[in-house]
Amino acid sequence: LICSGANACVLHYRAGNAAVKPGDLVLIDAGCEYQGYAADITRTFPVNGRFSPEQRALYEVVLKAQLAAIAKVKPGNTWNQPHDATVRVITRGLIELGLLKGKEKDLIKSEAYKDFYMHRAGHWLGMDVHDVGDYRIDGRWRQLEPGMVLTIEPLTFT
């Protein structure tokens, strides 16, 4: 999946018929298979090689969210802890950028961030790009265990 400009704001955009313009961002969501296992990566790049100040600011928020989530991926933590970390960082960043107004705690509780960040931070990865496996067991978030493979790919849509 490769898209740019406003089309990069459409989750899993497929048409692929728009021209790439200077000032746009290009979103690449790609994967491959190797020896029966899947890979998945999502990255964003400026078309002309340089972020605008606004693009860079939002890119930095998402990068901080990704790093915060990665820090939560460890045995004993639950599936939801990396996602919760991204929600906190992204909500705080959207407030700092003036895209959300209010108190961080209230905006998270009301899910106001979902106007910009409407999906989960990642998914299981294995023999399929979106591999099988429960995220909850008996209504509780699943604990992460050694050997589990998951993606951490927060995205914002503005």
Task: Give the predicted meaning of each segment.
Residues 1-158:
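Active-site neighborhoods and metal-handling regions in enzymes and metal-associated proteins
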